[in-house]
Amino acid sequence: MQPIGDWKLGANLAYFDSQDNGRKLGGTLDNDLTSVNLWAGIGAHTLRLGYQKVGGDNAFPFLTETDPYIVNYIQILDFTRKDEKSWQARYDVNFASYGIPGLTAFVRYVTGDGFDGMGGASGKEWERDVDISYVIQQGPLKNLGVRWRNAMVRSNANIGDLDENRLIVSYTIPLM
């Protein structure tokens, strides 16, 4: 992030060009993906806007056991279908500014379209995520964290409609 007065501004830009190579035992591969994430924050608040576009003849290829940094790779969906275009809006708040250190939250909405949906329909999907996290700041349970993640997906692709809740308990051990 780059501070400008009281504001903090930032951007992540990524471009992936994936092409087949060698004997093409897995078939042909032709994909490019552009990912843009811009954000502005002041005080406890941060607003993020993202755009992602998939081009070429295939969906974005994932290497086994890897997670690429692309803006719309989120809790359930990744918005990487062939020809998919997706937009994201996200709002974060850090409640330390309001006297509750350790409490953070965000809400995010991503919508994608332009791909082939089920039964030849024009593909459309969206995901809404809510994330609330609290880390104990002092006492015998210091650094113990609890996070609730809720995701709602609506899609006319093979995933369909899905609602998911995750409760994550973590404990951070300082090394220094």
Annotate each PLM feature.
Residues S18-D30, A59-T64, F115-G123, N156-D163:
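Outer-membrane beta-barrel translocator domains and adjoining extracellular loop/strand segments
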Residues V54-G120, E127-S133, Q137:
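C-terminal structural cap/anchor segments
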Residues L9-L13, V36, H45-L49, A89, ...:
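Transmembrane beta-strands of outer-membrane beta-barrel proteins
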Residues M1, L38-G41, D92-A96, S133-Q137, ...:
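Transmembrane beta-barrel domains of outer membrane proteins
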Residues W7, D30-T34, D83-W87, K124-R128, ...:
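Residues that define the transmembrane beta-barrel architecture of outer-membrane proteins
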Residues Y15-Q19, I42-A44, Y51-D57, F95, ...:
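Transmembrane beta-strands of outer-membrane beta-barrel pores
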Residues Q2-L9, A96-L103, Q137-V146, P174-M176:
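Short loop/turn motifs that connect adjacent beta-strands in outer-membrane beta-barrel proteins
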Residues A89, V130-I136, D161-M176:
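Outer-membrane beta-barrel "beta-signal"
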